[in-house]
Structure formats: C-alpha cells, structure tokens
C-alpha cells in the first residue's frame, strides 16, 4: 500500500525528522522499541505507509538518515526513539560540510551520496507500491541544502514518476545562523524548482512567532518548533494512514495545488494552535478551524498571504465532522474573501477529511496554500544574495570546491524568474483572455 520513504539530511533535517517519528509513532501506537502497544486496529491497518514490519512484529521506520558529520545522528540515536531506526540506515561522513553548499553538493556530499542511494534503493524495493519520498532538510546550511538537493536530483533520475515532497526550512528574515545562508538557499531553490514536486516552505522565525504569540511559550526550543512542523507533516499524510471520507495523497495534492509546474512552493499551517494551559476550554467547530486556518498568524513561513493571492489551497481536516459542513465552510471562505483568491481558478480549495484526529485533539486541520505571497521569501533571500554576490564576498569558499560563478548567476536569475512568475499570476485577471500569451512571449524575450 502507498508507502512513503522518508529521508532526513543535515542537522536541521535530522532534528525535524526525529521529532516527526516521535509524533507518528505516537499516532500509530508504536513504542520506542518498535513494539505495537496501541488500542485500535485502525492504527495498524495502514501502518506500512511509514513502517516496515520486521521479524518478531517490530515496526521499523522507512527512514534514511544522512549527515556529513556524526554529531546530530548520535543525538538522534541517543534520543527517545533512537532505537527505532534500522542501524544500517544511518549514513554519515566525518568531515562536515561547514555550511558550504558546494561541499554538500559537489565534494564531501558527492562522495557519500552513493551509499545513501543504496539505502534509499533498498527501502524503495521493500515497498509494494511506493508513492514517493518526503525529505526534511534546511536550505541555509551545507548538508541539508547541498547534499539534500543532490539526493533529490539523483532520486528524481532513478524514480522519475514517484512524488518528491520536501519540507524545506528557509533562512529567516531576522535570525540568521550563518552569513552565507543567502548563497546556500538560492543554490538550493534553483535545484528545487527543477527537481521537486512539492516544497513545503517553513522558516524558524514564523515558527518562533507561533510558539511565542499563540502558544504562549516564553522560551521556545527547537524541539517546540520541530513539533509544529511534525504536526503538519503528519496532517499531510494522514489520509494515507487512516480511513477517511474524502481522501487525498501526495499526488492528488500536487494535481490540485500546482497550476503551473514551477509554482510548487507552498505555505503550510496547522490548527488548532492553543497554549497548553487553555486547551481544555476551547470547543472546536469546523467554522472556527477554518477561520484559524486562513489566519496569517498561523502560517509557518514568514510571508503574509494578505500581500498576495491564493492560486490554490488545500485543507486537510482530521476528526469526526460532517463533510457537508466542511464544504460549506470552504465555499464560505472563498465567497467572503474572494479578493484573496484568483478568480480564474474557480473552486480553488481542495478539502479532505480523515476520521482519526491526532493525539489529544478532537479535530484538527492542516492547511497547504499555494499563494503568490510566497515570493516575499524569495525576494528577501535574493536581495541578500545580490548584496553579497555583487562584491563576490565569500565566493572563494565555493569556487575552491570547484564551483563556477556562472552557477551562481544562473541560480540568481532562476529565482528572480520565479518571483516574477508569481507576480504575473497575482496580477492576472480572468478578463485578459488573449493578452496572456503575448505578455509571456515578451517576458521570455526579456529574460
């Protein structure tokens, strides 16, 4: 049944991944040793989407863990669910990528990539009907961005018809880990535009804001941030894992969300987000969930959907609720806020309903939006990129690994093209029938 192979790369990817497996194992009643302790057959019915059943009834994640230094992997192995993973699926180097995309993509990462691909292949062969791959990684570092995109390109080559879904942590506007983030991120976007099917854009600052403002956590840890992301990843694939009234899977999502092949960068959100103290006082209704879901404060990336328009959106509900009510609410949102949806795609919200809510909640919803406002993220990175690239600052770290300046220029213009494509569709109206083609032709000539 529709399995998904999960790959986590680099420090950020491995930390998000580790948290994700905690959340999923909890949902399926799998304890840290891989033994099932659940209370419902539904947990086991499609557990094989993410788990392999090994001898003695142990459930082993279909996960591949990669990094260019052993540190993060050691802490995953020592973490609460570290013994769950198959030991051969930890692949790590010793050198580290030193936040250098070129090291991850061309030198250090390229040396390790074949052993990673062997494990990915082995996991894929263990599937009945592989649906696709999901990858958690960051865009600002060296391993997750450089080696992550290298792996995506290689897997794409070998499995061209399987879905490739990434959860990519973009550099944040205010908090920066490394000076060369704009370089690494731009080079990665360049790759993701070509090789990924769906990119869920996440950034730490938006996650901090959610923890701080909505969840009222005074000092949010990365664990708290990663928990938010895990809730989303779990929501996206919940329809594959539990029975539902309106199903969706990675491919249906893609078909419904991507009007033009390059525009596959999505904003994600999860509701209900309530602080730990006030959880028990809130009875949730479908209208409340829907209203919260489209709230800009709940978006997990620092782009404001009110500054753009939704091309498409998808709402994945979980819990016992009437589908009629869900449909009404979706229509209601589109009618009330019609200016925020492009009018040349009628009914552009896809909804799905899965009967089993996540642990501790009566109902929840995951939101995935394809909004033109995402261009804010790319613009911001692009400006920082240009500022440094104009002076050729830090370039020697990349050229020293055998990269060419040309590749930087290409990545920069590809990202700027992406921004103007989003802008073009934000401004497009249903009336301009014949004009669109001429505009595009001019645009290509200009590019």
Curated annotation (Swiss-Prot):
**Keyword annotations for this protein?**
Cytoplasm, Cytoskeleton, GTP-binding, Magnesium, Metal-binding, Microtubule, Nucleotide-binding
* GO biological process annotation, one example: microtubule-based process
Annotated segments matching region Disordered: 424-447
Give the superkingdom in one word: Eukaryota
Transmembrane stretches, start-end: none
Function text:
Tubulin is the major constituent of microtubules, a cylinder consisting of laterally associated linear protofilaments composed of alpha- and beta-tubulin heterodimers. Microtubules grow by the addition of GTP-tubulin dimers to the microtubule end, where a stabilizing cap forms. Below the cap, tubulin dimers are in GDP-bound state, owing to GTPase activity of alpha-tubulin.
Annotated family: Belongs to the tubulin family.
Please give the subunit comment from the record. Answer: Dimer of alpha and beta chains. A typical microtubule is a hollow water-filled tube with an outer diameter of 25 nm and an inner diameter of 15 nM. Alpha-beta heterodimers associate head-to-tail to form protofilaments running lengthwise along the microtubule wall with the beta-tubulin subunit facing the microtubule plus end conferring a structural polarity. Microtubules usually have 13 protofilaments but different protofilament numbers can be found in some organisms and specialized cells.
Report the protein name in the record.
Answer: Tubulin beta-1 chain
The protein's organism comes out as Cyanophora paradoxa
Q: Which gene encodes it?
A: TUBB1
């Amino acid at each position: 049944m529709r399995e998904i192979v999960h790959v986590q790369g680099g420090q950020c990817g491995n930390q998000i991944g580790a948290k994700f497996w905690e959340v999923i194992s909890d949902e399926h009643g799998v304890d840290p040793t891989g033994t099932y302790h659940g209370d419902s057959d539904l947990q086991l019915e499609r557990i094989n989407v993410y788990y392999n059943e090994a001898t003695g009834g142990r459930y082993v994640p279909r996960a591949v863990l990669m990094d260019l230094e052993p540190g993060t992997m050691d802490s995953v192995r020592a973490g609460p669910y570290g013994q769950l993973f198959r030991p051969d699926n930890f692949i790590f180097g010793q050198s580290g990528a030193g936040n250098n995309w070129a090291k991850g993509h061309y030198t250090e990462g390229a040396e390790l990539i074949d052993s990673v691909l062997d494990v990915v292949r082995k996991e894929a062969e263990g599937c009945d009907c592989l649906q696709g791959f999901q990858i958690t990684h960051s865009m600002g570092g060296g391993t997750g961005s450089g080696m992550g995109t290298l792996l995506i390109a290689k897997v794409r080559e070998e499995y061209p018809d399987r879905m490739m879904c990434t959860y990519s942590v973009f550099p944040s506007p205010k908090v920066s880990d490394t000076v060369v983030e704009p370089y690494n991120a731009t080079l990665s976007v360049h790759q993701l535009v070509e090789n990924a099917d769906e990119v869920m854009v996440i950034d730490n600052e938006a996650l901090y804001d959610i923890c701080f403002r909505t969840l009222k956590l005074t000092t949010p840890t990365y664990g708290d941030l990663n928990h938010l992301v895990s809730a989303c990843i779990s929501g996206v694939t919940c329809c594959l894992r539990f029975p539902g009234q309106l199903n969706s899977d990675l491919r249906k999502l893609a078909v419904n969300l991507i009007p033009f092949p390059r525009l596959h960068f999505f904003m994600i959100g999860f509701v209900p987000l309530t602080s730990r103290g006030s959880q028990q006082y809130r009875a949730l209704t479908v209208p409340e969930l829907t209203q919260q879901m489209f709230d800009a404060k709940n978006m997990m990336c620092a782009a404001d959907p009110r500054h753009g328009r939704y091309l498409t959106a998808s709402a994945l509900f979980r819990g016992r609720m009437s589908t009629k009510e869900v449909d009404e609410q979706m229509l209601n949102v589109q009618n009330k806020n019609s200016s925020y949806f492009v009018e040349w795609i009628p009914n552009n919200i896809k909804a799905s309903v899965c009967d089993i809510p996540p642990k501790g909640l009566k109902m929840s919803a995951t939101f995935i939006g394809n909004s033109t406002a995402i261009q804010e993220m790319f613009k911001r990175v692009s400006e920082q990129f240009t500022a440094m690239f104009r002076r050729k600052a830090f370039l020697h770290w990349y050229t020293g690994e055998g990269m060419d300046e040309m590749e930087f220029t290409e990545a920069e213009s590809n990202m700027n093209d992406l921004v103007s494509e989003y802008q073009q569709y934000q401004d497009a109206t249903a009336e301009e029938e014949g004009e669109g083609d001429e505009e595009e032709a001019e645009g290509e000539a200009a590019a």
